From Swiss-Prot:
GO terms for molecular function: 4-hydroxy-tetrahydrodipicolinate reductase; NAD binding; NADP binding; oxidoreductase activity, acting on CH or CH2 groups, NAD or NADP as acceptor. Belongs to the DapB family. One of its GO terms (biological process) is diaminopimelate biosynthetic process. Pathway: Amino-acid biosynthesis; L-lysine biosynthesis via DAP pathway; (S)-tetrahydrodipicolinate from L-aspartate: step 4/4. The keyword Amino-acid biosynthesis applies. It catalyses: (S)-2,3,4,5-tetrahydrodipicolinate + NAD(+) + H2O = (2S,4S)-4-hydroxy-2,3,4,5-tetrahydrodipicolinate + NADH + H(+); (S)-2,3,4,5-tetrahydrodipicolinate + NADP(+) + H2O = (2S,4S)-4-hydroxy-2,3,4,5-tetrahydrodipicolinate + NADPH + H(+). It comes from Cutibacterium acnes (strain DSM 16379 / KPA171202) (Propionibacterium acnes). Transmembrane segments: none annotated. It is found in: Cytoplasm. This is 4-hydroxy-tetrahydrodipicolinate reductase. Its EC number is 1.17.1.8. Its main location: cytoplasm.
Length: 246
């Protein structure tokens, strides 16, 4: 049995993770820690799953790594600087793995993969991500990652800038720009997590869309990460490799 602790256990995602861990046949929930809780309750875990906040996650990971505990992270707010901090910390603990994923939904991961494959064929590309209004970051980590993948594929294909003749606009009307790709964020009551990637060429468009209607859709990926991180020392970003998509 894999002994699992959950940080952020009382949040929406943390609650769902606790339930998924308890229901899986090969995992055991040994600690459910929330804000203000005692992290030492997780000292006996094989893996800590972190769904906390961008302000708390790095301190949580430093604690876990220093205690030689593997981690699976769904908390947002990661950038190159934070990834490098983790690499430096993990270098002193060569047998410990840390998996950080912008999205644990298998469908969302496939959506990003398909978008990366399609990007080199289309002159235009934009992203619309839609989430519940309690989400604290915009654009979402999934949208940022998708934009980065699209930009890399476009560069490899020799495509230039996305065509856009806009000269006059209201502030924010064209969304944020992530590595040359426009990203639009919607926050609406009733939504959970949704994203569509729009591609365009002469005479046609292609839309790749994924919808998560319930947080249970993320649990298969979380459990895949819990099982997989034990065999992946160092830093792993995304679950694509665990799904055979790399």
């Amino acid at each position: 049995m894999i002994k699992v602790a959950v940080f952020g256990a009382k949040g929406r995602m943390g609650t769902a993770v606790c339930q998924a861990v308890e229901e899986a046949e090969d995992t055991e929930l040994v600690a459910a820690v929330d804000s203000g809780g005692d992290r030492s309750d997780a000292s006996g875990a094989d893996v800590i799953v972190d769904f906390t906040t961008p302000d708390a996650v790095m301190d949580n990971l430093s604690w876990a790594i220093s205690h030689d505990i593997n981690t699976v992270v769904g908390t947002t707010g990661f950038d190159d600087e934070r990834y490098q901090v983790l690499r430096d910390q993990l270098a002193d603990h060569p047998n410990i793995g840390c998996l950080v994923a912008p999205n644990f939904s298998i469908g969302a991961v496939l959506m990003m993969h398909f978008a990366e494959q399609a990007a080199r064929f289309y002159e235009s590309a934009e992203i619309v991500e839609l989430h519940h209004p309690n989400k604290v970051d915009a654009p979402s980590g999934t949208a940022r990652t998708t934009a980065t993948k699209i930009a890399a594929a476009r560069q490899e294909a020799g495509l230039g800038e996305v065509p856009d003749a806009t000269k006059s606009q209201l502030n924010g009307a064209r969304g944020a720009v992530v590595e040359g790709v426009h990203v639009h964020s919607v926050r609406l009551r009733g939504l959970v997590a949704h994203q569509e990637v729009l591609f365009g060429a002469e005479g046609e468009t292609l839309t790749i869309r994924h919808d998560s209607m319930d947080r249970v859709s993320f649990m298969s990926g979380v459990l895949t990460g819990v099982r997989g991180v034990l065999d992946r020392p160092g830093l792993t970003v995304g679950i694509e490799g665990l799904l055979g998509l790399e």
